Amino acid sequence: MKINFQKRLLALAIAAVMTLSLAACGQKNGPAASSGSQGAATGSAEVQSGGQEGIVAFTDQAGRQVELEGPAQTVVSCYYVTTYAAIALGVADRVVGLEKKADTRPIYHMAASALLEKPQVGTMKELDVEAVAALAPDLVVMPKKLMDYADTLEELGFQVMVVEPETHEGLVTMLELLGQACGVEDRAAQLTNYYEEQLDRMAQLTEGTERPLVYLAGNSSYLTAAPDAMYQSSLIEGAGGTNVAAGLEGDYWAEVSYESVLAMAPEVVIIPAGAEYTVEDILGDPQLASLPAVQSGAVYAMPSGIEEWDSPIPSGILGTMWLTSVLHEDVYPFADFVADAQDFYQTFYGFQLDGSLITK
């Protein structure tokens, strides 16, 4: 909802006080949702008509009702996933504030450098309510992990959309909702249709093929793995592989021992884009010398200079496609993937991606 000048002043006055109280509240009641949760994706949207012509009303992914006077023209994105989505949906110019550490995201430099000049309002752990209020956005978009801040912002007169794109389905729903909120439904449909079409295409290409045993390691250590409840597990399955860590409990990176990794006996090991270690670290670890993937040299690192394709982001479908080309190059050659990835960025991000950045 757009707020008037008087409400802006009220927001600024209250925000400083609310920031302190909210921080205390968040420590006691912070949500347990994690970035890898495979929770149910909710959310629906519709444009109201009749007596409320032009009103955009929808239910967000936390089951909350959101109502805008019209398509949002100014947006604060508190989450890199939704900032990425704004770029892909062609509304990056409407983002007036975003998450911190924006300069560490290569895609901002490549596709939307103006974002680097925008105010940064918070992290996945805390949000600067006063900074958000000062920007007076039509819409604030935040991950479920920050949902404690939603009520505070609404009390200040702002509309808040909570998202949870932690599954393939949840990501598609998030894109549809953000497209609806910004009045770019056709663009969102184009993006989600591409996503679904490529999932189907990868499934068809790998149908009837052997499904290699895959170990997808975490960012901080290769002695962490993705349980079945994580988005990363669906990436492996969608690429025609079998997640050897699927039986682990939890919805976030699970710590494992050397003995456990050896018992899983993966034929392929995948290192994510944000890893703090290298292929050479794994190949050179004497405690993994008997691992099938190490013995055959089948340890691959996802490209690190573009986006985090192992994450639930608009380009996340490229993670499934990249892995398909690694696991099943006989049916989907790596050169074909490179061409597809370049076409994706040209179509949805508006720039020609340097093919040398696409590695394995």
Each predicted region: which residue ranges?
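N-terminal low-complexity, Pro/Thr/Ser-rich intrinsically disordered segments
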Residues: 37-69
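Structural recognition of the beta-strand scaffold that forms the well-ordered cores
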Residues: 76-78, 96-99, 139-143, 160-164, ...
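Bacterial lipoprotein signal-peptidase II cleavage site
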Residues: 23-42
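Alpha-helical, coiled-coil/dimerization segments enriched in small aliphatic residues
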Residues: 225-253, 257
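Proline-aspartate-enriched helix->loop->beta-strand connector
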Residues: 121-124, 129-142, 158, 257-273
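A short, structured surface patch at a secondary-structure boundary
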Residues: 77-135, 139, 145, 244
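Extracytoplasmic substrate-binding proteins
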Residues: 54-55, 67, 148-224, 245-247, ...
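Sec-dependent N-terminal signal peptides of Gram-positive bacterial secreted proteins and lipoproteins
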Residues: 2-29
